[in-house]
C-alpha cells in the first residue's frame, strides 16, 4: 500500500495527469463501482509506466493526438502566408482628351507661392475658384492658341512659321521667369505688368503679319496655277479660240501705244483697217509667223519687217517688235515701245515694222 502510494506520488511529481488515462490501466474497475467512497485507487505498476510518457514534450503530443482521436475534433491549420495589403487610390479621376487623369495638380514652389498669394488677394477659400478666375481672365489668349492650332493643322507652311514664333515666345517667357515676382509683394508690380502687355502685343502683331503674308502668297500661287490650267485647256480643246485670244492680247498693246504727230483724233481710222487686214490677209500672218519666207520684206541690218498690201489705201508707217510671237507666258511688248508715225512721203499700201528696244 505504501509502495503504490509512493508510486502515485512519484507520478504526481512528474506532472498532473487526467483521470481518464488511469482508468484504463487500473486492475480493479469493479472495486470502484462497489466502493465509490474509496479514494485510494489501486493501479498496476506496469500499466502506469506504459501509459505515462517519458517527457513533457512527448506527453503534449500524446495528449493532443489522443484527445482529437477520442472526441473526433479537427482543428484547421493556420496558414503562415501573409496577404499583401493593396493601397487603394481613393482620388477621383476625370476623362480628358489624353485619357484618364487625376484631379490633383502638383505645383512647384514658386508657382504655389504666387498662386496662394493671388488667392488671398482675391479672397477665395478654394483653389478651384482661383483657377476659374484665371481661366476667365485668359479667354482671349486661349482663343488665340486655338486659332493658331487650327491654322497649323490646315497649313503646314504656316505651322512652321507659327512654331518659330511660339518658340521665341517661350524663350522670352523663360527669360522673364527668373525675374518672376510674388503678386502683391513686388514694388514694381504695375511696371512689370505693362512691360508684359507690350511684349504680348508685339508678338500678336508679328503673328498677324506672318499670317497675312502666308495667305497672300498662297492665293497668288493658286490664281496663277488656275490661269495656266485654263489656258492649256482652251488651247487643247479650241485652237481657234486660243488664237483669237492671242491676237487680242497682241493687238491691245498696239492700240494703246499709238502716237499721233497730228492733232486730229484718228484713232478709229488708224487701227481699224490694219486689224481687219491682219485678220483677213493670210500673207501678213505668213510673213509674221514664218520669218524664213519674208524675202525682200525683211532687212537684217535695220531689223525692218515690211508688209505690203496694194489694196490698202491707208498711208502710215508702223514699227513693231521683230520677235513677235504668240506666247501665253511672255508678253512680247514687255520693256519695248511701239511707235506709229504717219508720213505722206511713204508710198500707199506699205506697212513698215521695225524693232525698237528701250534701254
Swiss-Prot record:
Residues 216-233 form the R domain. Residues 165-176 have a biased composition (Acidic residues). Axillary shoot and floral meristems. The keyword DNA-binding applies. Residues 157-179 are annotated as: Disordered. The keyword Nucleus applies. InterPro entries: CYC/TB1_R_domain, TF_TCP_subgr, Transcription_factor_TCP. One of its GO terms (molecular function) is DNA-binding transcription factor activity. Residues 87-145 form the TCP domain. It is found in: Nucleus. GO terms for biological process: flower development. Involved in petal morphogenesis. This is Transcription factor TCP1. It comes from Arabidopsis thaliana (Mouse-ear cress). The lineage of its organism: Eukaryota, Viridiplantae, Streptophyta, Embryophyta, Tracheophyta.
